[in-house]
């Protein structure tokens, strides 16, 4: 089984809650499936982190080259399962995540459009499951318009991936007393939930 782990928080260097979630999830998963192949990618280390879609690079097609679109699409095509983590940034997922989805949402590569019927068909049907792990500073419900986790789920489903696992949101990271705790300690408080997700993945 090939597991593709994608990290997309802008706080990776300072310490990312969502990245800690991902690391803990993979730790538990490997305890159950030590034979599986794990590939981990921090999107911040690649060109797409600083390559956003604009009118110019869309028209001249250079966006897809600079964002290494084919590289990421090929990684997705070879994966059996995905672990995707990011944090909420200004009520949405990170700009790096947006760049990633722009790079992989490509007609005739990851989805088909029937112009006669308007029907879309996702092509990433090889992906058997996606575990979405996110973090946000506010408690759940503070920003009902900012459901970044559900949006990520819907995009993967649009592209043909199965998302059988419930997404997990580590919320309230910026409010007391949570913001007084080391990241690892706060994440560890939810480790039983993460372990169950890993067991069912």
UniProtKB/Swiss-Prot annotation:
Where is FMN bound in this sequence?
9, 16-18
Q: Does the keyword Flavoprotein apply?
A: yes
Q: How is the cofactor bound?
A: Binds 1 FMN per subunit.
Instruction: Name the chemical reaction catalysed here.
Output: 2 a quinone + NADH + H(+) = 2 a 1,4-benzosemiquinone + NAD(+); N,N-dimethyl-1,4-phenylenediamine + anthranilate + 2 NAD(+) = 2-(4-dimethylaminophenyl)diazenylbenzoate + 2 NADH + 2 H(+)
E.C. designation(s): 1.6.5.-, 1.7.1.17
Return one GO MF term: oxidoreductase activity, acting on NAD(P)H, quinone or similar compound as acceptor
Q: Which cofactor does it need?
A: FMN
Q: Does the keyword Nucleus apply?
A: no
Q: Name one Pfam family in it.
A: Flavodoxin_2
The record's keywords, sorted A to Z, are: Flavoprotein, FMN, NAD, Oxidoreductase
Which residues does UniProt call coiled coil? none
Q: What class of enzyme is it?
A: oxidoreductase
Oligomeric form and interacting partners: Homodimer.
Its annotated function is as follows: Quinone reductase that provides resistance to thiol-specific stress caused by electrophilic quinones. Also exhibits azoreductase activity. Catalyzes the reductive cleavage of the azo bond in aromatic azo compounds to the corresponding amines.
- Member of which family? Belongs to the azoreductase type 1 family.
Q: What is the protein name given in its UniProt record?
A: FMN-dependent NADH:quinone oxidoreductase
């Amino acid at each position: 089984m090939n597991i593709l782990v994608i990290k997309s928080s802008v706080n990776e260097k300072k310490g990312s809650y969502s990245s800690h979630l991902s690391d803990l999830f993979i730790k538990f998963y490997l305890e159950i499936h030590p034979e599986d192949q794990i590939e981990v990618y921090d999107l911040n280390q690649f060109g797409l982190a600083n390559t956003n879609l604009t009118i110019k690079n869309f028209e001249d097609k250079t966006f897809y080259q600079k964002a290494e679109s084919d590289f990421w699409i090929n990684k997705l095509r070879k994966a059996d399962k995905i672990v995707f983590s990011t944090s909420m940034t200004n009520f949405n997922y990170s700009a790096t995540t947006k760049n990633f989805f722009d790079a992989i949402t490509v007609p005739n590569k990851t989805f088909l459009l029937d112009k006669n019927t308007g029907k879309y068909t996702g092509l990433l049907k090889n992906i058997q499951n996606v575990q979405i792990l996110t973090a946000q500073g506010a408690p759940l419900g503070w920003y009902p318009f900012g459901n970044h986790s559900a949006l990520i789920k819907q995009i993967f489903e649009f592209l043909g991936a199965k998302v059988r696992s419930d997404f997990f949101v580590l919320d309230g990271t910026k409010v007391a007393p949570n913001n007084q705790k080391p990241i690892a300690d706060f994440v560890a408080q939810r480790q039983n939930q993460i372990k169950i997700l890993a067991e069912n993945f």
